[in-house]
């Protein structure tokens, strides 16, 4: 399921992040990928140990927690802390697939933890007219989809998808990216639950008979109970 979620960040929040990132120290993005990815990845990335990465990451996680649509679409169990990248002129990232299992930050009790990447997320931090090129291109069974969204908007898509970032030919593209392990492993099941949840919300807003809404809500939770992994 490819889904555009508008205004995760307000204009003020996105601008503030841009300003703080402008003064940051960036590193070669190839340092965070394996040999295959390094052959096609040409961008800059905020270091994992950067205090700014942690600060902005917390702000993004707080914003995501305030979005009912994000929660309904992802049903998050675990989230990798947001990372940040920058594409300048001639930067690009060729077709690649995200790793299936990723390490989470070490817990206070030093217990190792990992995340299964079910959903890939890109949060755009500057507007499309500030750069040329730089489209996120996602390939699926229906072809290739070009994504280039306003600052503060989020795109989510299955981590099983091949995807790339087109070459930037003018300006600079700044974004945050992260992965989610969902309570519901299968993308088709998540899509069905989102459609059902959306229908329930619409019927509730239109003052439909309470018993009808209750029956649909019962179906939703029983499906979630059957499909979820905790």
From Swiss-Prot:
Record-level GO BP terms: DNA damage response; intracellular iron ion homeostasis
Name of protein: PKHD-type hydroxylase Xfasm12_1709
Pfam families linked to this entry: 2OG-FeII_Oxy_3 (PF13640), PKHD_C (PF18331)
GO MF, one annotated term: L-ascorbic acid binding
Cofactor note: Binds 1 Fe(2+) ion per subunit.
Residues binding Fe cation, per UniProt: 96, 98, 163
Domain Fe2OG dioxygenase, residue spans: 78-182
Cofactor: Fe(2+); L-ascorbate
SUPFAM superfamilies: Clavaminate synthase-like (SSF51197)
Positions annotated to bind 2-oxoglutarate: 173
Keywords for this protein: Dioxygenase, Iron, Metal-binding, Oxidoreductase, Vitamin C
HAMAP family: Hydroxyl_YbiX
